[in-house]
């Protein structure tokens, strides 16, 4: 996961105005980093492009809004990176 985390953290720092040094695996993209929905969409688009995947953001948001999963499941970086790794592995299938 560490290379995935580094890549994602770099994308977040480049896409937003967040200092790369403040981004950790425990960071919650919204609560800790203060990323707004527009910036998050830009970040997801950049992640999709960098990893050659399609993050199912609409599905994830719906699951969170319906209370099926806690926001931490998708929006804490270590968990987001694990999901990215799963999507990459599934694509390689």
From Swiss-Prot:
Carrier of the growing fatty acid chain in fatty acid biosynthesis. Is involved in the transfer of long hydroxylated fatty acids to lipid A. GO terms for molecular function: acyl binding; acyl carrier activity. Signal peptide: none annotated. This is Acyl carrier protein AcpXL. PROSITE patterns: CARRIER, PHOSPHOPANTETHEINE. The modification O-(pantetheine 4'-phosphoryl)serine is found at residue 37. One of its GO terms (cellular component) is cytosol. Residues 2-88 form the Carrier domain. Keywords: Cytoplasm, Fatty acid biosynthesis, Fatty acid metabolism, Lipid A biosynthesis, Lipid biosynthesis, Lipid metabolism, Phosphopantetheine, Phosphoprotein. It is found in: Cytoplasm. Its main location: cytoplasm. GO terms for biological process: Kdo2-lipid A biosynthetic process; lipid A biosynthetic process.
